């Protein structure tokens, strides 16, 4: 059956071809495909990815990622598992680096036992997915994954103890997730993110201490001892508003991997963010100060409710568009090449007006002379969700990351990735099933 010309002009050819060629017999897999693949395909095509890379990444998405996303969320039905990845508990998210025209995705692998008494904190689903990816990603190395998982993820014995003692567990239970940088040429770099919250509750050890001790144990030759010591000192200075949150590392051999410590900052004002950017004055080189000027400019363009921000303690239902102010997230890269930890600032966009944010980003991108998808950002965002009014929506953009490298801003936008292009995708799905659109 032919697809209408209208739908055919909306979505890239690789999406259509694979929708016809891939096995879409599983109901949940099919729904995840038509919910996430159209936006995935559109962003790759718009960024000029090699067509072979587009097919490769979409095939990996269908064959490895989608089977690990669990049951598809249905309105009015309780979700199988709510992931800390998004405010809706959805386990998949796309992001785009507008400085490098680089697409990324992140997901929390879910399994059939996730959330049951046999795997109450979803610690078991991630390894089978990594084994599948190992066959597809040359250079994938699990040494640091194994190390940090053992140090920061709750063990089976600890999980049983938590349940047996009926200890109160927070709503955010995610232990780990995976992310991938997708190069336009077809190469992939995988990363893992590990959350020590439940381990901290089980052991009585603060999250920061768990992460710092795990890093010291991994850093056998003390290559990042200096920036780590400064980070420990800095976080202590910023207490109680700067809180340790989670840790990430690249899944490559340890000598080439980066370690990042993520924190939440509750004190939302420009002076607070300036202090984080300069590490309370420790970073004062010309590039840092140039980056500070750009950061101040971005601050003026994005909506922030200033003051002491409460920590989130709930998920929202998909299909809603709530208003809220989230804390900032900061990551600090620990590198042997720098004596100081290098901060990256994440502006919370979720809960703020999407049109205001999109226009602010467009102004900032234009002032930098960025082309490609940066040039068409507001129009592209609106096109992903044609049935959503940006003037009243607060949920299409989740985070905006900012750092400064090579004398220019380095920025990514993390986007709501659920039922984009819904009308066009539904038409393709109906044609695949043999129904008239």
From Swiss-Prot:
GO terms for molecular function: transferase activity, transferring alkyl or aryl (other than methyl) groups. InterPro entries: Aro_prenylTrfase, Aro_prenylTrfase_DMATS, DMATS-type_fun. L-tryptophan binds at residues 84-85, 93, 195. Its EC number is 2.5.1.-. Pfam families: Trp_DMAT. GO terms for biological process: alkaloid metabolic process. CDD domains: PT-DMATS_CymD. Pathway: Secondary metabolite biosynthesis. Substrate binds at residues 104, 191, 193, 258, 260, 262, 344, 346, 410, 414. It catalyses: cyclo-acetoacetyl-L-tryptophan + dimethylallyl diphosphate = beta-cyclopiazonate + diphosphate. Disruption phenotype: Impairs the production of cyclopiazonic acid and of its biosynthetic intermediate beta-cyclopiazonic acid, but accumulates the intermediate cyclo-acetoacetyl-L-tryptophan. Keywords: Alkaloid metabolism, Transferase. Cyclo-acetoacetyl-L-tryptophan dimethylallyltransferase; part of the gene cluster that mediates the biosynthesis of the fungal neurotoxin cyclopiazonic acid (CPA), a nanomolar inhibitor of Ca(2+)-ATPase with a unique pentacyclic indole tetramic acid scaffold. Belongs to the tryptophan dimethylallyltransferase family. This is Cyclo-acetoacetyl-L-tryptophan dimethylallyltransferase cpaD.
């Amino acid at each position: 059956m032919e697809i209408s010309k209208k739908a055919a002009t909306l979505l890239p050819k690789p999406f259509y071809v694979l929708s016809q060629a891939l096995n879409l017999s599983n109901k949940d897999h099919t729904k995840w495909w038509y919910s996430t693949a159209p936006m995935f395909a559109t962003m790759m095509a718009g960024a000029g990815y090699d067509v072979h890379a587009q097919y490769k990444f979409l095939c990996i998405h269908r064959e490895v990622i989608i089977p690990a996303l669990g049951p598809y969320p249905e309105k009015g039905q309780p979700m199988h598992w709510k992931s800390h990845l998004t405010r809706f508990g959805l386990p998949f998210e796309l992001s785009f680096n507008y400085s490098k025209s680089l697409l990324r995705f992140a997901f929390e692998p879910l399994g059939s036992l996730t959330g049951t008494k046999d795997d109450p904190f979803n610690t078991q689903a991630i390894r089978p997915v990594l084994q599948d990816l190992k066959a597809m990603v040359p250079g994938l190395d699990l040494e640091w994954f194994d190390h940090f998982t053992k140090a920061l993820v709750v063990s089976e014995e600890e999980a049983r103890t938590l349940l047996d003692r009926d200890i109160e567990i927070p709503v955010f239970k995610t232990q780990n997730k995976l992310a991938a940088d997708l190069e336009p040429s077809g190469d992939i770099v995988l990363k893992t993110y590990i959350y020590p919250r439940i381990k901290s509750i089980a052991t009585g050890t603060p999250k920061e201490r768990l992460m710092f001790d795990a890093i010291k144990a991994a850093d056998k030759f003390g290559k990042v001892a200096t920036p780590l010591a400064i980070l420990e000192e800095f976080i202590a200075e910023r207490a109680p508003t700067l809180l340790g949150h989670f840790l990430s590392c690249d899944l490559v051999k340890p000598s080439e991997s980066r370690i990042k410590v993520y924190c939440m900052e509750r004190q939302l004002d420009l002076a607070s963010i300036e202090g984080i950017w300069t590490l309370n004055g420790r970073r004062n080189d010309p590039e840092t100060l140039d980056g500070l000027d750009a950061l101040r400019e971005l601050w003026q363009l994005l909506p922030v409710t200033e003051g002491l921000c409460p920590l989130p303690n709930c998920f929202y239902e998909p299909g809603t568009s709530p208003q809220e102010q989230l804390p900032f997230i900061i990551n600090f890269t620990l590198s042997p090449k720098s004596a100081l930890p290098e901060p990256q600032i994440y502006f919370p966009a979720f809960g703020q007006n999407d049109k205001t944010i999109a226009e602010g980003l467009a102004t900032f991108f234009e002032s930098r002379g960025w082309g490609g998808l940066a040039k068409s950002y507001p129009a592209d965002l609106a096109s992903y969700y044609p049935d959503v009014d940006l003037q009243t929506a607060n949920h299409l953009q989740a985070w905006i990351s900012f750092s400064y490298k090579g004398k220019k801003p380095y920025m990514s936008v993390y986007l709501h990735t659920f039922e984009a292009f819904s009308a066009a995708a539904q038409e393709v799905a109906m044609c695949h099933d043999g129904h008239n659109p």
